[in-house]
Protein backbone atom coordinates (compact mmCIF):
# COMPACT_ATOMS: atom_id res chain seq x y z
CA UNK A 1 0.00 0.00 0.00
CA UNK A 2 1.38 3.47 -0.88
CA UNK A 3 2.61 5.39 2.17
CA UNK A 4 0.24 8.29 1.48
CA UNK A 5 -2.78 6.01 2.00
CA UNK A 6 -1.49 4.95 5.40
CA UNK A 7 -1.05 8.55 6.54
CA UNK A 8 -4.76 9.33 6.76
CA UNK A 9 -4.37 12.88 5.38
CA UNK A 10 -7.50 13.23 3.23
CA UNK A 11 -6.17 16.15 1.19
CA UNK A 12 -2.96 14.28 0.35
CA UNK A 13 -4.89 11.11 -0.47
CA UNK A 14 -7.21 13.02 -2.80
CA UNK A 15 -4.24 14.70 -4.51
CA UNK A 16 -2.56 11.31 -4.92
CA UNK A 17 -5.70 9.78 -6.44
CA UNK A 18 -6.09 12.70 -8.84
CA UNK A 19 -2.51 12.29 -10.01
CA UNK A 20 -2.94 8.53 -10.44
CA UNK A 21 -6.04 9.10 -12.56
CA UNK A 22 -4.34 11.71 -14.73
CA UNK A 23 -1.28 9.52 -15.21
CA UNK A 24 -3.41 6.57 -16.32
CA UNK A 25 -5.31 8.73 -18.78
CA UNK A 26 -2.12 10.31 -20.10
CA UNK A 27 -0.61 6.87 -20.66
CA UNK A 28 -3.60 4.97 -22.05
CA UNK A 29 -6.09 7.50 -23.45
CA UNK A 30 -4.49 10.93 -23.95
CA UNK A 31 -7.18 11.65 -26.56
CA UNK A 32 -9.71 12.00 -23.74
CA UNK A 33 -8.12 15.31 -22.75
CA UNK A 34 -9.28 16.71 -26.09
CA UNK A 35 -12.85 15.53 -25.51
CA UNK A 36 -12.92 16.80 -21.92
CA UNK A 37 -10.33 19.53 -21.36
CA UNK A 38 -8.64 19.39 -17.94
CA UNK A 39 -9.34 22.04 -15.35
CA UNK A 40 -6.59 24.63 -14.69
CA UNK A 41 -5.48 22.68 -11.60
CA UNK A 42 -5.45 19.42 -13.57
CA UNK A 43 -3.48 21.08 -16.36
CA UNK A 44 -0.83 22.26 -13.92
CA UNK A 45 -0.59 18.73 -12.55
CA UNK A 46 -0.37 17.29 -16.07
CA UNK A 47 2.47 19.69 -16.86
CA UNK A 48 4.28 18.50 -13.73
CA UNK A 49 3.72 14.85 -14.67
CA UNK A 50 5.21 15.49 -18.10
CA UNK A 51 8.20 17.26 -16.56
CA UNK A 52 8.72 14.37 -14.14
CA UNK A 53 8.57 11.87 -16.98
CA UNK A 54 11.16 13.79 -18.95
CA UNK A 55 13.67 13.67 -16.09
CA UNK A 56 16.59 11.25 -16.32
CA UNK A 57 16.12 7.98 -14.45
CA UNK A 58 18.58 6.32 -12.09
CA UNK A 59 19.74 3.10 -13.73
CA UNK A 60 22.32 2.14 -11.12
CA UNK A 61 22.75 2.86 -7.40
CA UNK A 62 24.69 5.99 -6.41
CA UNK A 63 27.91 5.71 -4.43
CA UNK A 64 28.15 7.31 -0.99
CA UNK A 65 31.59 8.44 0.18
CA UNK A 66 33.28 11.00 2.39
CA UNK A 67 33.72 14.31 0.56
CA UNK A 68 37.10 15.78 -0.32
CA UNK A 69 38.13 19.32 -1.18
CA UNK A 70 38.09 18.32 -4.84
CA UNK A 71 34.31 18.02 -4.47
CA UNK A 72 33.87 21.62 -3.31
CA UNK A 73 32.96 23.16 -6.71
CA UNK A 74 30.23 20.56 -7.24
CA UNK A 75 29.00 20.88 -3.65
CA UNK A 76 28.76 24.67 -3.86
CA UNK A 77 26.93 24.43 -7.19
CA UNK A 78 24.36 22.06 -5.64
CA UNK A 79 23.94 24.38 -2.64
CA UNK A 80 23.34 27.35 -4.96
CA UNK A 81 20.69 25.35 -6.81
CA UNK A 82 19.04 24.54 -3.48
CA UNK A 83 19.25 28.20 -2.44
CA UNK A 84 17.51 29.23 -5.68
CA UNK A 85 14.84 26.56 -5.20
CA UNK A 86 14.10 27.75 -1.66
CA UNK A 87 13.94 31.35 -2.86
CA UNK A 88 11.43 30.47 -5.58
CA UNK A 89 9.27 28.74 -2.97
CA UNK A 90 9.61 31.67 -0.53
CA UNK A 91 11.41 29.67 2.13
CA UNK A 92 13.65 31.89 4.27
CA UNK A 93 16.38 29.28 4.60
CA UNK A 94 19.89 29.39 3.09
CA UNK A 95 19.10 32.86 1.73
CA UNK A 96 22.16 34.54 3.24
CA UNK A 97 25.83 33.62 3.27
CA UNK A 98 25.22 30.33 5.08
CA UNK A 99 26.15 27.66 4.15
CA UNK A 100 29.26 28.75 2.26
CA UNK A 101 32.63 27.39 1.18
CA UNK A 102 34.09 27.77 4.68
CA UNK A 103 31.19 25.77 6.11
CA UNK A 104 31.88 22.83 3.83
CA UNK A 105 35.65 23.09 4.16
CA UNK A 106 35.18 22.66 7.91
CA UNK A 107 32.82 19.72 7.36
CA UNK A 108 35.31 18.08 5.00
CA UNK A 109 38.20 18.63 7.42
CA UNK A 110 36.14 17.02 10.18
CA UNK A 111 35.26 14.06 7.98
CA UNK A 112 31.53 14.65 8.42
CA UNK A 113 30.64 15.77 4.88
CA UNK A 114 29.48 13.06 2.48
CA UNK A 115 28.55 13.07 -1.18
CA UNK A 116 26.48 10.77 -3.33
CA UNK A 117 28.05 10.32 -6.74
CA UNK A 118 26.19 9.03 -9.77
CA UNK A 119 28.14 7.78 -12.75
CA UNK A 120 31.20 9.52 -11.36
CA UNK A 121 29.63 12.96 -10.76
CA UNK A 122 28.62 14.49 -7.43
CA UNK A 123 24.81 14.42 -7.31
CA UNK A 124 24.01 15.14 -3.64
CA UNK A 125 25.64 16.24 -0.42
CA UNK A 126 24.96 15.94 3.31
CA UNK A 127 26.75 16.36 6.62
CA UNK A 128 26.27 13.88 9.45
CA UNK A 129 27.64 14.63 12.92
CA UNK A 130 27.65 12.65 16.14
CA UNK A 131 28.55 15.26 18.76
CA UNK A 132 25.71 16.73 20.88
CA UNK A 133 24.16 19.77 19.18
CA UNK A 134 23.92 22.73 21.63
CA UNK A 135 20.95 24.31 19.83
CA UNK A 136 19.03 21.07 20.20
CA UNK A 137 19.39 21.19 23.99
CA UNK A 138 17.14 24.26 23.95
CA UNK A 139 14.24 22.45 22.26
CA UNK A 140 10.86 24.03 23.04
CA UNK A 141 7.24 22.95 22.56
CA UNK A 142 8.09 19.27 22.76
CA UNK A 143 10.74 16.75 23.70
CA UNK A 144 13.30 14.51 22.05
CA UNK A 145 12.60 10.80 21.90
CA UNK A 146 16.22 9.71 22.52
CA UNK A 147 19.17 10.84 24.65
CA UNK A 148 21.58 13.33 23.10
CA UNK A 149 24.70 11.17 23.48
CA UNK A 150 23.37 8.52 21.10
CA UNK A 151 21.84 10.71 18.38
CA UNK A 152 23.31 11.51 14.98
CA UNK A 153 22.45 14.91 13.49
CA UNK A 154 21.81 15.52 9.79
CA UNK A 155 22.86 18.91 8.38
CA UNK A 156 23.10 20.60 4.99
CA UNK A 157 21.55 17.97 2.75
CA UNK A 158 20.84 18.89 -0.86
CA UNK A 159 20.37 17.12 -4.20
CA UNK A 160 21.48 18.41 -7.59
CA UNK A 161 18.68 20.00 -9.61
CA UNK A 162 19.57 17.55 -12.39
CA UNK A 163 18.41 14.65 -10.21
CA UNK A 164 15.39 16.05 -8.40
CA UNK A 165 12.36 13.85 -8.71
CA UNK A 166 14.37 10.69 -9.35
CA UNK A 167 14.29 9.27 -5.83
CA UNK A 168 17.86 10.31 -5.08
CA UNK A 169 16.78 12.19 -1.95
CA UNK A 170 15.25 8.96 -0.63
CA UNK A 171 18.51 7.10 -1.29
CA UNK A 172 20.35 9.89 0.54
CA UNK A 173 18.16 9.36 3.60
CA UNK A 174 18.84 5.63 3.47
CA UNK A 175 22.58 6.31 3.47
CA UNK A 176 22.19 8.68 6.42
CA UNK A 177 20.51 5.94 8.44
CA UNK A 178 23.08 3.35 7.38
CA UNK A 179 25.98 5.54 8.49
CA UNK A 180 24.23 6.43 11.74
CA UNK A 181 23.63 2.78 12.58
CA UNK A 182 27.19 1.81 11.71
CA UNK A 183 28.43 4.48 14.12
CA UNK A 184 26.23 3.18 16.93
CA UNK A 185 23.63 5.96 16.92
CA UNK A 186 20.18 5.15 18.29
CA UNK A 187 18.45 8.01 16.46
CA UNK A 188 18.86 10.65 13.75
CA UNK A 189 17.87 14.27 14.40
CA UNK A 190 17.40 17.05 11.87
CA UNK A 191 15.82 20.49 11.67
CA UNK A 192 14.35 22.52 8.84
CA UNK A 193 12.41 25.71 8.19
CA UNK A 194 8.70 25.43 8.90
CA UNK A 195 7.92 26.47 5.30
CA UNK A 196 10.30 23.94 3.71
CA UNK A 197 7.54 21.61 2.59
CA UNK A 198 9.73 19.44 0.37
CA UNK A 199 12.15 18.64 3.20
CA UNK A 200 9.34 18.02 5.68
CA UNK A 201 7.61 15.60 3.31
CA UNK A 202 10.90 13.77 2.79
CA UNK A 203 11.36 13.43 6.54
CA UNK A 204 7.81 12.28 7.13
CA UNK A 205 8.14 9.75 4.31
CA UNK A 206 11.10 8.22 6.11
CA UNK A 207 9.45 8.00 9.50
CA UNK A 208 10.76 11.14 11.21
CA UNK A 209 8.51 12.69 13.84
CA UNK A 210 8.16 16.34 14.79
CA UNK A 211 9.65 16.86 18.27
CA UNK A 212 9.57 20.63 18.84
CA UNK A 213 11.19 23.90 17.83
CA UNK A 214 14.72 25.27 18.00
CA UNK A 215 16.56 28.45 17.06
CA UNK A 216 19.41 28.19 14.56
CA UNK A 217 22.36 30.49 13.94
CA UNK A 218 21.74 31.87 10.45
CA UNK A 219 22.59 35.60 10.67
CA UNK A 220 20.03 37.97 9.22
CA UNK A 221 17.47 35.25 8.52
CA UNK A 222 14.49 33.72 10.28
CA UNK A 223 16.15 31.59 13.02
CA UNK A 224 13.12 29.42 13.83
CA UNK A 225 13.35 25.77 12.86
CA UNK A 226 11.21 22.70 13.35
CA UNK A 227 13.08 19.71 14.74
CA UNK A 228 12.47 16.08 13.79
CA UNK A 229 13.82 12.76 14.98
CA UNK A 230 13.75 9.12 13.92
CA UNK A 231 14.54 6.27 16.27
CA UNK A 232 16.70 3.59 14.67
CA UNK A 233 15.59 0.05 15.37
Where are these regions (language model features)?
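Conserved GNAT-fold acetyl-CoA-binding loop/helix
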Residues: 83-103
Amino acid sequence: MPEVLRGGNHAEIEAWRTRQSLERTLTKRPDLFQQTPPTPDEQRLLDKIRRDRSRPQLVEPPVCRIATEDDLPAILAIVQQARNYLCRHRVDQWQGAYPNEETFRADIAAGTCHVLTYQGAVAAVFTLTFAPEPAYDALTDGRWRSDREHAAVLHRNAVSANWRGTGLSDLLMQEVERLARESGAHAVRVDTHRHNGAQKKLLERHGYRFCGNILCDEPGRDPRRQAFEKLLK
